[in-house]
């Protein structure tokens, strides 16, 4: 029978905790990426709705934040131009159609990143499961 040391069990537990910690961190990052995807979707819907209203010759009424939870009512008279965040603190003016395309590309990139993160999370979970199986095997001889 193989002798199992307390150090072996501690090492196994430490490895399991590390996998668990990494998996939790990855889940938090995945939630942030998912929130960005949702934000892209919301921006796309809003731009398209504003384009429709503008094409009908109407103005859209909205509320603009002025700070500290305060808003003023404003009318959007021209939805043909959109300021799009390019990242790293830079923005650019684009047509509404270009902005929708930019958001579509960004969403595709974020979706790929989310898929990669999901694959990594699966590996962490499989690693934890393998360690749990190993721990069960180590405990069985001592119970017999």
From Swiss-Prot:
SUPFAM superfamilies linked to this entry: Prefoldin
A GO CC term attached to the entry: cytoplasm
Record keyword Chaperone present: yes
Record-annotated disulphide pairs: none
This protein's UniProt keywords: Chaperone, Cytoplasm
Chief place of localization: cytoplasm
Intracellular or extracellular location(s): Cytoplasm
Alphabetical list of InterPro entries matching this protein: PFD_alpha_archaea, Prefoldin, Prefoldin_subunit_alpha
GO biological process: one example: protein folding
Any Pfam family the entry gives: Prefoldin
Single Gene Ontology MF annotation: unfolded protein binding
Entry annotated with the keyword Cytoplasm: yes
Quaternary structure note: Heterohexamer of two alpha and four beta subunits.
Role according to the record: Molecular chaperone capable of stabilizing a range of proteins. Seems to fulfill an ATP-independent, HSP70-like function in archaeal de novo protein folding.
NCBIfam families: prefoldin subunit alpha
Family that this chain belongs to: Belongs to the prefoldin subunit alpha family.
Protein name: Prefoldin subunit alpha
GN (gene name): pfdA
């Amino acid at each position: 029978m193989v002798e199992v040391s307390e150090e072996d069990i501690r090492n196994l537990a430490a490895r399991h905790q590390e996998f668990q910690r990494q998996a939790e961190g990855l889940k938090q990052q995945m939630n942030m990426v998912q929130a960005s995807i949702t934000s892209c979707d919301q921006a796309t819907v809003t731009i398209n709705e504003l384009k429709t209203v503008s094409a009908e010759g109407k103005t859209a009424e909205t509320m603009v934040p002025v700070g500290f939870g305060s808003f003023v009512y404003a009318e959007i008279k021209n939805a043909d131009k959109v300021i799009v965040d390019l990242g790293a603190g830079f923005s650019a003016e684009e047509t509404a159609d270009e902005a929708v395309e930019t958001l579509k590309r960004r969403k595709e990139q974020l979706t790929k990143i989310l898929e990669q993160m999901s694959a990594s999370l699966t590996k962490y979970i499989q690693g934890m499961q393998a360690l749990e199986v190993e721990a069960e095997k180590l405990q069985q001889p001592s119970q017999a």
